[in-house]
Amino acid sequence: MEYDAGDSAGAEESSAGGPPGTQYVQSLARGLDVIRAFDAEHPAMTLTDVARRTGLSRATARRFLHTLADLGYVRFDGKLFELTAQVLQLGYSYLSSHTLPQLIEPVLEELSAELNESCSASILDGADVVYIARVHTRRIMRVGIAVGTRFPAYATSMGRVLLAHLAPAELDRALAARPLVPLTPSTIVSEESLRAELAAVRGRGWCFVDQELETGLRSIAVPVFGADGTVQAALNVSTSTPAPSLGTQEEPLATALEMLPRLSAAAERISAALRARR
């Protein structure tokens, strides 16, 4: 949607564009859209780039960018805008006020040490998974992952675990929010096939993804249930495929399933802690 140059960037309240029956601050929503426009593929952008990615006019985008710069969230070198480290404080506010990452991190550290593999936890945000905890091994991984990293849920093991436990209407919205595009030759891009896989994931209680997000990356994930029985997060163990030159023969799923009992036990420890806090 294109907003004309006369649109106000102030803090007016409007129900237009907002959820029906709620108070909606349109200018705040636009400012957050500007922040979200920056990502791994677009770390630094011109004014025109930001306007294009947000659907705002150049005049409106300029006001938001310079406001964010005055507040310390954006820097401008005369040509390109980029986020500053101060943006991390927004995410830290969530992490520091939410008990889930605090419960998960020590469990992941133990699990990673036991398996000598990288372990992660994530939650669902729309059509994406967002990492809320991560423990790395010393192995070199082709995908750079840290707390706050977002990936399309449909192509990840944790994402599929989380999608699989959504109510039907919520799943419909999540799948409609993002097109299924091939990230690797192995990525499932048929909605019918994905829905069938999600049903299978829900039934068996775990998900294995083999090189669908990135070639060479495999992972297995399980859900973490809250005190009310709903899925609060997902845990996974990720591994990289052996280099072809090593001549290693392996059965990927069998290897992943060897780790499943410890992964499931870790998830149950977190679930038990959540139940105890009820």
Regions found by a protein language model. Give the residues of each.
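Short hydrophobic beta-strand micro-motif common in sensory/regulatory domains
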Residues: R218-V222
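N-terminal helix-turn-helix
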Residues: M1-S97, P101-Q102, E268-A276
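Short, solvent-exposed recognition segments
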Residues: E2-D7, I140-T215
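Amphipathic alpha-helical effector-binding/dimerization core
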Residues: E82-R178
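Short, structured helix-loop boundary elements
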Residues: Y24-L28, T84, S97, P101, ...
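Sensor-regulatory modules in signal-transduction proteins
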Residues: V224-A227
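Juxtadomain coupling helices with adjacent low-complexity linkers
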Residues: R204, Q232-R278
